[in-house]
């Protein structure tokens, strides 16, 4: 965005951070001071019936402050970054038209990147191609498909773990549909599109000064989810004939581990440990994305007054007092 366009653009405050960094508390604290509406930037919160394992805002919290892009998709269906971008831009405009302030809040950095930087020419998901790849994985295993990917797109394969089924499948799907490696398509300039041209997104990032503190929070939160009935929630989902571990919804952190426990593949303690480890790995990826944003305003989420600091940073953004 040019300096002239930036000066005339409407500022949109964004509250980003890894799992368990205190985003919900900060967003609700800001809502006590300003007439905001929260637009979720979270790929897990879109799914209905997945409340405990996603740490979804409670009914009381959602009644107190309008929330958007929560409970909008059935777990049997997919929801893409392109759909998120279109929905978020529409909501930002509608909220502003009502005389209220939109606040984007969440930790799905792929969504945030799609929103702020536009979309590359990646094809939509193809159910037939995915079914074929799922069948191949069931027969040969995901490490074998990872090796297949390494032969056609070594750059993408190098950044994926051999058991990262969701991303391996997507990279192979893109190649099968386009004949081009995903890494090449992502390296191309995003499509020109003026849908967000009048907006200036300013990220406030909750990041830990001590990773051990965040890890302790993650463990405590996972234990609290288990106490709140997370296993029962997954059991209800597992009883549905149309849900399986290959779906994006069931790849959400914690759900796969609980499902495998219910299948008898692991014991309870192993399930808990794997769920916490997977959440920590997600946190690591989220922080990697955040630290690649030089424009972000960092708030230490380990500080005792982190919520107050985050609200102050967001208010400076909204009042035009943040660095341009």
UniProtKB/Swiss-Prot annotation:
Protein keywords: ATP-binding, Magnesium, Nucleotide-binding, Transferase, tRNA processing
EC numbers: 2.5.1.75
HAMAP family listed in its UniProt record: IPP_trans
UniProt keyword ATP-binding present: yes
GO function terms (MF aspect): ATP binding; tRNA dimethylallyltransferase activity
Family: Belongs to the IPP transferase family.
Region feature (Interaction with substrate tRNA): 42-45, 166-170, 251-256
EC top class named in words: transferase
Pfam family, one: IPPT
Catalysis: reaction(s): adenosine(37) in tRNA + dimethylallyl diphosphate = N(6)-dimethylallyladenosine(37) in tRNA + diphosphate
Name of the protein in its database record: tRNA dimethylallyltransferase
Superkingdom assignment: Bacteria
Organism encoding this protein: Burkholderia pseudomallei (strain 668)
Residues at which ATP binds: 17-24
Site feature: Interaction with substrate tRNA: 108, 130
Quaternary structure and interacting proteins, as annotated: Monomer.
Gene designation: miaA
Cofactor: Mg(2+)
UniProt: substrate binding residues: 19-24
Function: Catalyzes the transfer of a dimethylallyl group onto the adenine at position 37 in tRNAs that read codons beginning with uridine, leading to the formation of N6-(dimethylallyl)adenosine (i(6)A).
Example GO BP: tRNA modification
């Amino acid at each position: 965005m040019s300096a002239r366009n930036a000066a005339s653009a409407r500022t949109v405050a964004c509250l980003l951070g890894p799992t368990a960094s205190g985003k919900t508390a900060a967003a609700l604290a800001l809502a006590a001071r300003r007439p905001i509406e929260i637009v979720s930037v979270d790929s897990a919160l879109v799914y209905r019936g997945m409340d405990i394992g996603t740490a979804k805002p409670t009914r009381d919290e959602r009644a107190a402050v309008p929330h958007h892009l929560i409970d909008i998709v059935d777990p049997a269906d997919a929801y893409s970054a392109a759909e998120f971008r279109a929905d978020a831009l529409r909501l930002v405009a509608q909220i502003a038209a009502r005389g209220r302030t939109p606040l984007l809040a969440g930790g799905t950095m792929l969504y945030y990147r799609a929103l702020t930087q536009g979309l590359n020419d990646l094809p939509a998901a193809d159910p037939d191609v995915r079914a074929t790849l799922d069948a191949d994985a069931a027969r040969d295993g995901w490490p074998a498909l990872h090796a297949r990917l390494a032969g056609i797109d070594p750059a993408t394969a190098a950044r994926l773990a051999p058991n990262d089924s969701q991303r391996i499948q997507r990279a192979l799907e893109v190649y099968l549909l386009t004949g081009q490696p995903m890494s090449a398509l992502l390296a191309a300039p995003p499509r020109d599109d003026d849908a967000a041209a009048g907006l200036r997104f300013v990220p406030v990032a909750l990041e830990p000064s001590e990773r051990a503190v965040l890890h302790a929070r993650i463990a405590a939160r996972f234990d609290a989810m288990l106490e709140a009935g997370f296993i029962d929630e997954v059991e209800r989902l597992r009883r549905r004939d149309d849900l399986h571990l290959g779906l994006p919804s069931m790849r959400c952190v914690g759900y796969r581990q609980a499902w495998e426990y219910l299948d008898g593949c692991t014991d309870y303690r192993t399930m808990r440990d794997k769920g916490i480890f997977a959440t920590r790995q997600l946190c690591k990826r989220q922080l990697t994305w955040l630290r690649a944003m030089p424009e972000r305003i960092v708030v230490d989420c380990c500080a005792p007054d982190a919520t107050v600091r985050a609200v102050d940073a967001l208010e400076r953004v909204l009042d035009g007092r943040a660095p341009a």
